[in-house]
């Protein structure tokens, strides 16, 4: 069985499959992805594969520099996005935006 390259919480699976979620914001541990990478995507909860994505762009961001566009690409409001990031990465202040398209 082939390993997944990146995982997402199951609650984001439907938005990714529908093309409503087109970025992910990660910490330094996942800052190595680069445009052109093709990644197998699994669910965080059970590592079950659900699609393949291609990385189209990467950039860095802080909570203070998040924009409404980032929120739109995550399919949530800016307030929701900041809250989710603080819940997942409570001790971090610098993040890595990975833009992608589903293949």
UniProtKB/Swiss-Prot annotation:
User: Its Enzyme Commission number?
Assistant: 3.5.1.135
Q: Which SMART domains match?
A: ASCH (SM01022)
Name any one GO molecular function.
Answer: N4-acetylcytidine amidohydrolase activity
Query: What Gene Ontology cellular-component terms does the record carry?
Result: cytosol
The ASCH domain, residue ranges:
6-100
Enzymatic class: hydrolase
List, from the UniProt record, the residues annotated as the active site of this protein. 21, 24, 74
Function in brief: Catalyzes the hydrolysis of N(4)-acetylcytidine (ac4C).
* InterPro entries (UniProt xref): AC4CH (IPR008314), ASCH_domain (IPR007374), PUA-like_sf (IPR015947)
Name of the protein described by the UniProt record: N(4)-acetylcytidine amidohydrolase
Q: PANTHER family from the entry? A: UCP029143 FAMILY PROTEIN
Which keywords, in A-to-Z order, does the entry hold?
Hydrolase
In the record, the note on similarity to other proteins reads: Belongs to the N(4)-acetylcytidine amidohydrolase family.
Q: Name one Pfam family in it.
A: ASCH
Q: Which reaction does it catalyse?
A: N(4)-acetylcytidine + H2O = cytidine + acetate + H(+); N(4)-acetyl-2'-deoxycytidine + H2O = 2'-deoxycytidine + acetate + H(+); N(4)-acetylcytosine + H2O = cytosine + acetate + H(+)
């Amino acid at each position: 069985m082939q390993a997944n390259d990146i995982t997402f919480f199951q609650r984001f699976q439907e938005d990714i499959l529908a093309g409503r979620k087109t970025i992910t914001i990660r910490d330094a541990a996942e800052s190595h992805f680069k445009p052109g990478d093709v990644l197998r995507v699994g669910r965080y909860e059970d590592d079950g594969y659900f699609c393949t994505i291609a990385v189209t762009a990467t950039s860095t961001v802080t909570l203070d520099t998040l924009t409404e566009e980032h929120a739109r690409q995550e399919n949530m409001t800016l307030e929701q996005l900041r809250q989710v990031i603080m819940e997942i990465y409570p001790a971090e202040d610098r993040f890595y935006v990975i833009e992608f398209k589903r293949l």
